[in-house]
Amino acid sequence: MPLIFKIGYNVIPLQDVILPTPSSKVLKYLIQSGKLIPSLKDLITSRDKYKPIFISHLGFNQRRIFQTNGNLKTITKGSRLSSIIAFSTQANVLSEVADEGIFETVYGKFHIMIESIEIVEVEKLKEEVEKHMNDNIRVRFVSPTLLSSKVLLPPSLSERYKKIHAGYSTLPSVGLIVAYAYNVYCNLIGKKEVEVRAFKFGILSNALSRIIGYDLHPVTVAIGEDSKGNLRKARGVMGWIEFDIPDERLKRRALNYLLTSSYLGIGRSRGIGFGEIRLEFRKIEEKEG
């Protein structure tokens, strides 16, 4: 079974800077230019939509920085920002991980320091699953999350509606969330041709789950620029949804996949910071349901 590496960084601008859109481009630029963990460059440039890498938006005061209204975000010199890179690779990346350094980028000059390193054996996530079999699952969307409901189309219909742009769900179902997590997990372990299984798993999870509560809201966010320099925008979801899956086998699988996505994210554009999630758990009360 593969390993997941999660590295937390402190990112301090050494001058006033205007952050790029999205702000994750600062660390992405350093990787692509070979200045930070160069072994990840091929993973970043891969066209695989479920590739095992997540680069968060920069954070300030425990909130992710992303652009919603077209206004650029200016950060003052000396501000302490945070970021996370999570990934899985066969390369010997630990030899490339430096504790700190000062880096020139096209966005300004930054002092970058490692705050934390976590290495997770995917197989051992099953131990964490068992701890939460009697809990409700709360999925919190830390950054705007882009989930296409077309993931729940039967595979026999996927090609027919391939060119229909329905946007992203701003009220995602349990099945949609866990189907995306399943796809991330399968890509991580090298399991191929999973479209039928993902569809069945999503439909079953919708049918056999119960929603305990939610606080979800849509957000329109800039995801980058087109070839003419115009902002590209998408409408995603933030907030949280809490649910339980009474069927033990199904819940065990859902927890396993969601725990993986708590490192690698879910949905579209995870490689530039969208779809960051955090799992929270609450004991099931007898009166629920």
From Swiss-Prot:
Signal sequence range: none
Function recorded in the entry: CRISPR (clustered regularly interspaced short palindromic repeat) is an adaptive immune system that provides protection against mobile genetic elements (viruses, transposable elements and conjugative plasmids). CRISPR clusters contain sequences complementary to antecedent mobile elements and target invading nucleic acids. CRISPR clusters are transcribed and processed into CRISPR RNA (crRNA). Functions as a ssRNA-specific endoribonuclease, generating an 8 base-long tag known as the 5' handle.
Name the record gives this protein: CRISPR-associated endoribonuclease Cas6 2
EC number: 3.1.-.-
GO molecular function: endonuclease activity; RNA binding
InterPro entries (alphabetical): Cas6_N_arch (IPR041165), CRISPR-assoc_Cas6_C (IPR019267), CRISPR-assoc_prot_Cas6 (IPR010156)
Domain of life according to the entry: Archaea
Cofactor: Mg(2+)
Protein family (similarity comment): Belongs to the CRISPR-associated endoribonuclease Cas6 family.
Keywords from the named record: Antiviral defense, Endonuclease, Hydrolase, Magnesium, Nuclease, RNA-binding
Any one Gene Ontology BP term: defense response to virus
Keyword Kinase listed: no
SUBUNIT field: Possibly part of the aCascade ribonucleoprotein complex.
Origin species: Saccharolobus solfataricus (strain ATCC 35092 / DSM 1617 / JCM 11322 / P2) (Sulfolobus solfataricus)
Enzyme class name: hydrolase
Pfam family, one: Cas6_N
